């Protein structure tokens, strides 16, 4: 099994006619994902030919869902148009909305996330995330499909590049699903959401959680793990050498005073029984030891 996506996921690409949308649609198709169309307001009725796939373009997500049966949307839309694109998907009751776009104003992200909660029909992953992959089943976003395989590990990460590294480090064991939740201050799906889903997934045997400095998401995840998660969890927290007050890569990755430090997050996770590596490679070794692999 997998979480959030599976072999039957039907994907539409919001912004498919743009350069990034086209490029990553091609890559998703090559990895076996079922991309069934795209959405670009004003270009409805057109089609896009990508590597032998003739993909229809629609004006709205609702039109695309009605015509294709799509149940996943991935958003490759410039930041200033992203809020409208996500609202369109929420209004259409799209079950899963994966927002890849980086640089969306925090107020816009908070607005569409709050709106999604009032509707109660859509899960948002992101923004500013690489998406998610269930190897051999579906790949939604920009995660390379050729760096790993299917297996019993669940991965949730704030960082795209660390997602890729961990998937490669553990490629011989493989993953049920890897989810990049994004590193912005406001995201639609949290570590806890993914931990809960992996705990409930019968084919996920162990979990890797990657966090980073800033905020208290990792501390809250640690409390959740202590109370709810019975499967083995290993972790890594990026940013041990980060200077105070400087944003490191992601908008949410910033240490303020004693709040949000890597050491504080590591301590909280270890208190919950999570083995935490000092490097991604050490984290992978910890998981191998737990799984006897």
Question: Language-model features: where?
Answer:
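Catalytic-core regions of core metabolic enzymes
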Residues: 1-293
């Amino acid at each position: 099994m997998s979480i959030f996506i599976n072999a039957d996921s039907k994907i539409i690409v919001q912004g498919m006619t743009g350069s990034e949308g086209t490029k990553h649609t091609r890559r998703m198709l090559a990895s076996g994902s079922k991309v069934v169309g795209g959405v670009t307001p004003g270009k409805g009725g057109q089609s896009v030919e990508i590597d032998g796939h003739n993909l229809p373009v629609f004006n709205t997500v609702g039109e695309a869902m009605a015509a294709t049966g799509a149940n996943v949307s991935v958003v490759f839309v410039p930041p200033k148009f992203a809020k409208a694109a996500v609202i369109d998907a929420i209004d259409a009751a799209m079950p899963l909305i994966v927002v890849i776009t980086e640089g969306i104003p925090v107020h816009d992200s908070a607005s569409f996330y709050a709106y999604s909660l009032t509707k109660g029909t859509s899960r948002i992953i992101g923004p500013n995330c690489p998406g998610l992959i269930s190897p051999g089943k579906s790949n939604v976003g920009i995660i390379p499909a050729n760096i790993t395989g299917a297996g019993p590990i669940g991965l949730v990460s704030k960082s795209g590049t660390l997602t890729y590294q961990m998937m490669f480090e553990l490629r011989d064991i493989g993953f049920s699903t890897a989810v990049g939740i994004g590193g912005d201050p406001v995201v639609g799906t949290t570590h806890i959401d993914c931990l809960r889903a992996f705990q409930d997934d019968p084919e996920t045997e162990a979990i890797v959680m990657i966090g980073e400095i800033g905020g208290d998401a990792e501390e809250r995840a640690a409390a959740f793990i202590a109370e709810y998660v019975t499967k083995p969890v290993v972790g890594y927290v990026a940013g041990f050498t980060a200077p105070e007050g400087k944003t490191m890569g992601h908008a949410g990755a910033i240490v303020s005073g004693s709040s949000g430090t890597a050491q504080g997050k590591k301590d909280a996770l270890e208190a919950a029984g999570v083995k935490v590596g000092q490097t991604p490679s050490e984290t992978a070794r910890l998981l191998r030891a737990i799984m006897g692999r």
